[in-house]
């Protein structure tokens, strides 16, 4: 143990200024007493906390967090704390801005502007939480595993899910088939293989996959107890499973647990890598437990598209031997480059989505109003983001007033999702102009021009988001809520008298098309069912006017 050096004698201020030796006596040293001087000492700094004290403080913090979670479980009928916090006035100065009607988000203020009932947004959360308490399942691990079914599930998982979250190791195919051919003993590897099978079955048929998921839940205590890379992968895929099942609250809960485990894993890794000179931190050594982003799993499928009858676990695991090494490395490199390009573009897009509602200025009397110069700058940054997109994830940017190109249905799910975010960002940039007109009940030429840009953005968004809801399985619930909010906002524009001078022909055509968009496979989500019924009612009322 390293002993900290303690300084017992400290010179007083008078002796220090005169640069003479001080005996350190309290309250007055002998030198000051003999000379009749005021003797005062500087206050010693508090010693830093020891490692043991720091660890104990962290343990107490985690125990307090667990106690809070247990107290919530003991009161299942109480509304979530976030709802209680939003029900009363908050002292946080940001809360009023985040719930501002200038921000096109699913908040109470926006729902009120769009003509919906009070606390409509919170009712969606309450419906999802209530469905969680009602949907209790019994675990059943005894079921027959078809090799053909798990192979088809792995192919569907690779095509529709893994492109968004490429976090599996290179040898996952071998582990997957070996695990599902074994006794399914509770472990993180068993849970991971069963979750991939469950998600893949949902990707092929939304009515399948329950038996694999129920079997995976038998390993949940092990997953929660461990803090390994495999346990984090299981928690991420548990969140993805609930996203595919349109249960956002459960998905969010497991995502939070995974986030805490990732932070702990990084802390433990950094603590053993402090000896930088001898560590492999800068070498990206493959033996370090942290994940490596350079190589991820890719499922190489030799048969023709649509013909899965000839696929077997043996052919899937040995397909690399039938393909040349150069072509395999090329396809893996291309997929890896596409994934990395997507995540870089997604990070930049998320930052823009956080500030795309900021085209608002505060006047001298404290009133918020639309700031057109900020909106134009935000749109310039958005176009600059598009110009930097690589060809592997680039989508076709339609000009204002242009028609939708049906060939975009051949885009990858990654490009389709980015395309929707691009249009949503434009909508959010110019929504403050629309709300300014609604608030003032009049439109200046500049406001009218920017409201027209909002209309053009919605016209471009509608066919793309309808396509993305079917293609982007993981984000189906999020995209459905976005479709509802943006369509309700477009209805508000169409019914605003001050905006009649804008070109509404294509807007009315798009709203008529929105009424034909099917909410497929959303029956199990009470919140989406409520959104569907409300949107259908408002579209019918608008059509009758």
Swiss-Prot record:
Keywords: DNA-binding, Metal-binding, Nucleus, Transcription, Transcription regulation, Zinc. Gene3D superfamilies: Zn(2)-C6 fungal-type DNA-binding domain. GO terms for molecular function: DNA binding; DNA-binding transcription factor activity, RNA polymerase II-specific; zinc ion binding. It holds the Pfam family Zn_clus. The lineage of its organism: Eukaryota, Fungi, Dikarya, Ascomycota, Pezizomycotina. SMART domains: GAL4 (SM00066). Residues 79-99 are annotated as: Disordered. Residues 12-39 bind DNA. It is found in: Nucleus. Its main location: nucleus. The keyword Transcription applies. InterPro entries: EcdB-like_regulator, Zn2-C6_fun-type_DNA-bd_sf, Zn2Cys6_DnaBD. GO terms for cellular component: nucleus. PANTHER family: ZN(2)-C6 FUNGAL-TYPE DOMAIN-CONTAINING PROTEIN, ZN(II)2CYS6 TRANSCRIPTION FACTOR (EUROFUNG)-RELATED-RELATED. This is Putative transcription factor ecdB.
């Amino acid at each position: 143990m390293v002993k900290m050096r303690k300084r017992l004698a400290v010179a007083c201020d008078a002796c220090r200024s005169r640069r003479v030796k001080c005996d350190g006596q309290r309250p007055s040293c002998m030198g000051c007493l003999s000379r009749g001087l005021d003797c005062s000492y500087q206050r010693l700094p508090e010693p830093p906390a020891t490692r043991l004290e720091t660890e104990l403080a962290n343990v107490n913090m985690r125990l307090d967090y667990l106690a809070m979670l247990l107290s919530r479980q003991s009161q299942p009928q109480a509304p979530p704390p976030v709802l209680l916090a939003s029900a009363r006035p908050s002292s946080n100065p940001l809360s009023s801005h985040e719930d501002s009607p200038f921000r096109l988000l699913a908040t109470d203020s926006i729902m009120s502007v769009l003509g919906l009932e009070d606390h409509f947004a919170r009712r969606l959360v309450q419906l999802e939480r209530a469905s969680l308490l009602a949907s209790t399942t019994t675990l059943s691990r005894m079921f027959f595993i078809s090799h053909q079914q798990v192979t088809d599930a792995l192919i569907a998982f690779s095509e529709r899910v893994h492109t968004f979250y490429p976090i599996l190791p290179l040898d996952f195919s071998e582990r997957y088939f070996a695990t599902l051919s074994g006794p399914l003993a509770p472990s993180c590897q068993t849970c991971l293989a069963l979750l991939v099978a469950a998600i893949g079955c949902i990707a092929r048929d939304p009515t399948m996959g329950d038996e694999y998921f129920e079997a995976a839940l038998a390993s949940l205590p092990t997953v929660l107890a461990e803090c390994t890379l495999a346990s984090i992968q299981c928690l991420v895929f548990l969140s993805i499973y609930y996203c595919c099942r349109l249960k956002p609250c459960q998905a969010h809960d497991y995502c939070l647990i995974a986030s805490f485990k990732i932070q702990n894993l990084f802390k433990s890794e950094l603590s053993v890598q402090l000896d930088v000179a001898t560590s492999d931190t800068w070498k990206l050594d493959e033996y370090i437990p942290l994940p490596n982003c350079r190589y991820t799993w890719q499922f190489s499928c030799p048969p023709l598209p649509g013909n899965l009858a000839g696929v077997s676990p043996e052919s899937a695991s040995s397909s690399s031997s039938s393909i040349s090494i150069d072509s395999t490395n090329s396809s893996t490199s291309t997929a890896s480059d596409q994934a990395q390009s997507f995540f870089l573009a997604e990070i930049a897009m998320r930052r823009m989505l956080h500030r795309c509602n900021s085209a608002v200025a505060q006047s001298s009397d404290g009133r918020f109003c639309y700031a057109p110069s900020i909106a134009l700058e935000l749109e310039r940054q958005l176009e600059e983001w598009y110009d930097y997109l690589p060809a592997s994830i680039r989508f076709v940017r339609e000009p204002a007033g242009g028609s939708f190109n049906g060939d975009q249905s051949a885009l990858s799910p990654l490009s389709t999702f980015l395309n929707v975010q691009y249009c949503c960002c434009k909508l959010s940039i110019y929504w403050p102009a629309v709300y300014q007109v609604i608030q003032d009940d009049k439109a200046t030429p500049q406001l009218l021009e920017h409201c027209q840009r909002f209309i053009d953005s919605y016209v471009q968004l509608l066919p793309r988001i309808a396509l993305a809801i079917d293609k982007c399985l993981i984000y189906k619930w999020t995209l459905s809520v976005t479709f509802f909010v943006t369509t309700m906002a477009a209805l508000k524009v169409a019914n605003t008298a001050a905006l009649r001078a804008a070109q509404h022909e294509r807007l009315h055509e798009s709203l008529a098309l929105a009424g034909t968009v099917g909410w497929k496979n959303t029956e199990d989500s009470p919140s989406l069912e409520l959104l569907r019924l409300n949107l259908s009612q408002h579209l019918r009322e608008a059509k009758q006017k």
